[in-house]
């Protein structure tokens, strides 16, 4: 419902950081709010389906659930994606490939672990499987289930949108294609994690 107020000329704060100036038909906000709104309203996930959870992920992208209405468009290349959805069992042979794809994604980037196998290793507690994607990548949203329903994936994507909306915009210091990102805050790469576990 839209209320038109002609008598008020002072800015009215409708949300923290967002003001409306009625007489000038102007909205005043911070650049961080606009950037966060843009990032959360247009998620482009890179789908990485490795097992039976991938079938549910494909069903979520089909016309019945229509992810486009949430601003979510599946991408086929990591260079155009900002969210990686890992659905299924991750083997130790596949882990370096996933880490490589993750590092090809532009900042800010997010990871969703979909299914019991991606969250904790699931029923595959063997020497050849990674016991949760968080051993190799920083995970933002966990979606449990074997396999989780498409509604659960949609809820996870909406939770990620809420998280993006509330987090401050990170200054990466990008200048002419060279990004100066503080790597100390990121989780270690797969090779260094693997070497630390041998000690």
Swiss-Prot record:
It is a peripheral membrane protein. It is found in: Cell inner membrane. NCBIfam families: nuoB_fam, PRK06411.1. This is NADH-quinone oxidoreductase subunit B 1. Pfam families: Oxidored_q6 (PF01058). The keyword Ligase does not apply. SUPFAM superfamilies: HydA/Nqo6-like. PANTHER family: NADH DEHYDROGENASE (PTHR11995), NADH DEHYDROGENASE [UBIQUINONE] IRON-SULFUR PROTEIN 7, MITOCHONDRIAL (PTHR11995:SF14). Its cofactor is [4Fe-4S] cluster. It comes from Thermodesulfovibrio yellowstonii (strain ATCC 51303 / DSM 11347 / YP87). One of its GO terms (cellular component) is plasma membrane. The keyword Iron applies. It catalyses: a quinone + NADH + 5 H(+)(in) = a quinol + NAD(+) + 4 H(+)(out). Binds 1 [4Fe-4S] cluster. One of its GO terms (biological process) is aerobic respiration. Belongs to the complex I 20 kDa subunit family. GO terms for molecular function: 4 iron, 4 sulfur cluster binding; iron ion binding; NADH dehydrogenase (ubiquinone) activity; NADH:ubiquinone reductase (non-electrogenic) activity; quinone binding. It comes from the Bacteria. Keywords: 4Fe-4S, Cell inner membrane, Cell membrane, Iron, Iron-sulfur, Membrane, Metal-binding, NAD, Quinone, Translocase, Transport, Ubiquinone. NDH-1 shuttles electrons from NADH, via FMN and iron-sulfur (Fe-S) centers, to quinones in the respiratory chain. The immediate electron acceptor for the enzyme in this species is believed to be ubiquinone. Couples the redox reaction to proton translocation (for every two electrons transferred, four hydrogen ions are translocated across the cytoplasmic membrane), and thus conserves the redox energy in a proton gradient.
């Amino acid at each position: 419902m839209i209320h038109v107020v002609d008598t008020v000329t002072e800015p009215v704060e409708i949300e923290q950081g967002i003001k409306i100036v009625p007489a000038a038909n102007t909205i005043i906000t911070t650049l961080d709010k606009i950037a966060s709104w843009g990032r959360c309203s247009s998620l482009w996930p890179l789908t990485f389906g490795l097992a039976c959870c991938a079938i549910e992920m494909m069903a979520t992208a089909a016309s019945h659930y229509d992810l486009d209405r949430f601003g979510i468009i599946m991408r086929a290349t990591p260079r155009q994606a900002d969210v990686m959805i890992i659905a299924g069992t991750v083997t130790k042979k596949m882990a370096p490939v996933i880490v490589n794809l993750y590092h090809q994604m532009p900042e800010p980037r997010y990871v969703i672990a979909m299914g019991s196998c991606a969250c904790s290793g699931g029923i595959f507690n063997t020497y050849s499987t990674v016991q949760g994607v968080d051993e190799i990548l920083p995970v933002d949203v966990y979606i449990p289930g074997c396999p989780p329903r498409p509604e659960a994936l949609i809820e996870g994507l909406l939770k990620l949108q809420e998280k993006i909306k509330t987090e401050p915009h990170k200054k990466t210091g990008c200048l002419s294609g060279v990004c100066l990102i503080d790597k100390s805050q990121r989780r270690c790469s797969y090779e260094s994690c693997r070497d630390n576990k041998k000690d």
